[in-house]
Structures are given as C-alpha cells and as structure tokens.
Amino acid sequence: MNLNLNSIFGQFSPDLVLFIPMTLTAVFLNLSWLSISNPSNWLPSRANLLILSFYQEVLKILFQQTNPNTAPWVSAFTAIFILIFSINVLGLLPYAFTSTSHISLTYSIGVPLWMSVNILGFYLAFNSRLGHLVPQGTPSYLIPFMVIIETISLFAQPIALGLRLAANLTAGHLLIFLLSTAIWTLSSSPSIASITLLIFFFLFLLEIGVACIQAYVFTALVNFYLSQNL
C-alpha cells in the first residue's frame, strides 16, 4: 500500500491504522500503570479509583437534569459516551484512524438510537407524540404547515446528530494537519516555526477538549430526545 503523507485527506483512510501498530502500543504503555497492584488489600486499586471517579463525574455531568423515567438508560448512555470519547481521543495518536470522523459510523450509532427512542415514545404515548407535531395555540389554518415543519424537524434530528460529530472531528484534524505542514515548511525559519509550534500545541489541547465535548453533546442529545418521548 502506498501512503501519501502529504495528502490532506490521507489521514482519514480507514486502512492506515491496520498497518501501523504504534497506536495500540502507545495505548498499552499509557495504561500499563493501571495493572500495578496496590500493596494494601484494604484500599481500592488505582484502576478502581480511576473508573469510579470517572464514572461519577460522567454521571454528574451527563445526567444532572435526567428525569426518573430515563434512569434505566443511564448505563447505556454512559457506555456510548465512553465509546465515542475513546475513539475520538485515540484518533489523535499519530497515524491513527478516527472512525467517528466518518458519517458511516456516526449515523450507524445515531440513527438506531434516534429510532429506538422515538418508537418507544410512540408506543407509550401515541396521541401525545402526535400532539407534539402541533404546538399549543397554533391557528387552525397553520396546522397543516406546522405538521409538515415539525415532521421535517423530527427527521432532521438523526442527520444533525451524526453530521455534527463527524464534521467537528474532521475540521479539527484538518487544522492540525495544516499547522503541522506549516511547521515543517517553516522549519528553515526557527522564530516563525516556534510560534507555529506553540499554536499547534494549544490547538492540540483544544482538539482533546473537542473530542470530549463532542462525545458529551452526542450523548446529551440522545438523552434529550429520550426525555421528550417519555
């Protein structure tokens, strides 16, 4: 396989990660400290503390406005958040493939979730769900138009759900690629290259934040759609 490292969209080729095992190596090296046992049997291990604290913070942020009806879905939404967040962060490793930058994956996750919560809503309260298509106080002559508009808005939810995640990650990776190319091009001028490298460093930190925020937004929107149907 011929790899074109100068291609701006070459990083989004799915088969790159299969030929470069450094991605998994870096992950295992960074997480190897979790396997170190604690000398005391009375205290929780590092892995238990990390998982527990992360789980509590995720639940606190994601589900602080969750109503009791959506409580059975908390574990599923937490798993979805961890899955998307892990894929986003691992995609920042060198030559790694960010699968969430492809709408084929984001729609494969978002559309079934959207369909499941809406089918559940129509199954539990069919008349109430139909009533949402006509806002309260709508004049009678506007009801047909409002039904069409609300129906289009309803079916636009899964499109926006998957497209938002893929578009933001793609834009962030393209910016990182362009800046790294600029650093290499301007390497003959140390002063300009150092400034560009500093900008690249802060942009990389911002991209880590975007990876977390996009996982949160995706999960929060699915949780919001569920709360509308219960």
UniProtKB/Swiss-Prot annotation:
Keyword Mitochondrion: yes
InterPro entries: ATP_synth_F0_asu (IPR000568), ATP_synth_F0_asu_AS (IPR023011), ATP_synth_F0_asu_bact/mt (IPR045083), F0_ATP_A_sf (IPR035908)
Entry superkingdom: Eukaryota
Membrane-spanning parts: 16-36, 73-93, 106-126, 142-162, 165-185, 192-212
CC terms in the record's Gene Ontology section: mitochondrial inner membrane; proton-transporting ATP synthase complex
PROSITE patterns: ATPASE_A
Molecular functions per Gene Ontology: proton-transporting ATP synthase activity, rotational mechanism
Membrane topology summary: Multi-pass membrane protein
Keywords for the protein's UniProt record, in alphabetical order: ATP synthesis, CF(0), Hydrogen ion transport, Ion transport, Membrane, Mitochondrion, Mitochondrion inner membrane, Transmembrane, Transmembrane helix, Transport
Subunit structure: F-type ATPases have 2 components, CF(1) - the catalytic core - and CF(0) - the membrane proton channel. CF(1) has five subunits: alpha(3), beta(3), gamma(1), delta(1), epsilon(1). CF(0) has three main subunits: a, b and c.
Role, per record: Mitochondrial membrane ATP synthase (F(1)F(0) ATP synthase or Complex V) produces ATP from ADP in the presence of a proton gradient across the membrane which is generated by electron transport complexes of the respiratory chain. F-type ATPases consist of two structural domains, F(1) - containing the extramembraneous catalytic core and F(0) - containing the membrane proton channel, linked together by a central stalk and a peripheral stalk. During catalysis, ATP synthesis in the catalytic domain of F(1) is coupled via a rotary mechanism of the central stalk subunits to proton translocation.
PANTHER family attached to this UniProt entry: ATP SYNTHASE SUBUNIT A (PTHR11410:SF0)
Record family assignment: Belongs to the ATPase A chain family.
This protein's name: ATP synthase subunit a
Organism from which the protein derives: Patiria pectinifera (Starfish)
Encoding gene (name): ATP6
